[in-house]
Amino acid sequence: MTVKTRFAPSPTGFLHVGGARTALYSWLYARANQGEFVLRIEDTDLERSTPEACAAILEGMEWLNLNWDEGPYYQTKRFDRYNEIIVQMLEQGTAYKCYCSRERIDTMREEQAAKGEQQKYDGCCRDKAPRDTDEPFVVRFKNPTEGSVVFDDHVRGHIEFANSTLDDLIIARTEGTPTYNFCVVVDDWDMGITCVVRGEDHINNTPRQINILKALGAPVPEYAHVSMILGDDGAKLSKRHGAVGVMQYRDDGYLPEALLNYLVRLGWSHGDQEVFSIDEMKQFFSLDDINKAASAFNTDKLIWLNQHYIKELDPEYVASHLEWHMADQNIDTSNGPKLSEVVSALSERAKTLKELAASSRYFFEDFAEFDETAAKKHLRGVALEPLTLFQSKLAGLNEWTLEAIHQAIEDTAAELEVGMGKVGMPLRVAVTGAGMSPAVDLTIFLVGKVRAEQRISKAIEFVANRINS
């Protein structure tokens, strides 16, 4: 049997980290078992579902590279199929029309609450013949009243619900639209889903859905209900903890590999290993290894992973993600070094791509003035001679190579009988406008000969004016 999983978000908001982790687990289980992964949009909540939210979900999935084999399917395009099954169930007696008014239902629940009883439908219309009337009605599933629903969850183990505790679920509303729990069942059946991976908040839906599947004569899939994600203070994850949409992490400068690596470890482990490539995730992932305890979101750990991937991934690939941030910060990269070279130069210190982009601006644009602190320390009178001598050596270079630039710096220091720092630091401030950069020879090489000469001239003028003032 081919393993087939699905991710079925509701387009009522962005794809948040909890949903992304569920999608990742479902995707990994399919990929680890040479199976198929289905994307389904559960948009039956017509009031809250929006095209913008749907687009955000698809964009998030694509950015994470969680590719799907089928879909996206939309529940709103399958209403005819749901209604077909509802008619079939009414004819077979596994569903019935309920004419109880909202007032009667509310009164019934109030009385049950006053008696300390479980609040559920009392079956008033369960065994009555359908009325030949225009009265409004809902359609309810005729849930078994005896026995139990039993299933073995990949994460939570053996779970059992007594049928006597389950309601006769509404499967079609008064206006005829099918309900969430019913649509899910028909979709999972029609799409051949063999394993449902979802959040623990769906556990109470599972026995109801299993009973509907059995009433339809449909196979029952396996289930894996994963725990919620908490903030580092133990409270349910919210925006103040960083529970933002997946694309916000892109905007903040995270690589998809870092977020995926972080999310897979939020509840799953393989020994003591912390860093996993996508191929390693597929190789080692198992639903049975997911921890049933809730996991705490730790932004520092995510930042650490992001730093790792910025340094370790192919600079060309990292540069492809950096392009968005350069454009977002209005940095024109058409006149400057290759972005992959910038990534190689700056990756050691960058925590995020957003930070990397901001720190690379001097490679592509001239700066208005020198950093005050750096200039005060390094563009003093003693810097005039090394800057002037190096500029003359720079002008005489026959080839623009890293080695030639490095040799020019060494020769300048040797001729002046000073340490490399006495030459390198003034040059760094001159060429970048600041006191921090990659190795000064590499920085000058990437800035380019014309820009480097212009900026050193500017620094010489700055120092001369300082001497004369």
Swiss-Prot record:
A motif ('KMSKS' region) lies at residues 236-240. It is found in: Cytoplasm. Zn(2+) binds at C98, C100, C125, D127. One of its GO terms (cellular component) is cytosol. The keyword Ligase applies. One of its GO terms (biological process) is glutamyl-tRNA aminoacylation. It comes from the Bacteria. Its main location: cytoplasm. Its cofactor is Zn(2+). GO terms for molecular function: ATP binding; glutamate-tRNA ligase activity; tRNA binding; zinc ion binding. Its EC number is 6.1.1.17. Pfam families: Anticodon_2, tRNA-synt_1c. Keywords: Aminoacyl-tRNA synthetase, ATP-binding, Cytoplasm, Ligase, Metal-binding, Nucleotide-binding, Protein biosynthesis, Zinc. A motif ('HIGH' region) lies at residues 9-19. It catalyses: tRNA(Glu) + L-glutamate + ATP = L-glutamyl-tRNA(Glu) + AMP + diphosphate. Binds 1 zinc ion per subunit. ATP binds at K239. Catalyzes the attachment of glutamate to tRNA(Glu) in a two-step reaction: glutamate is first activated by ATP to form Glu-AMP and then transferred to the acceptor end of tRNA(Glu). Monomer. Belongs to the class-I aminoacyl-tRNA synthetase family. Glutamate--tRNA ligase type 1 subfamily. This is Glutamate--tRNA ligase. The lineage of its organism: Bacteria, Pseudomonadati, Pseudomonadota, Gammaproteobacteria, Alteromonadales.
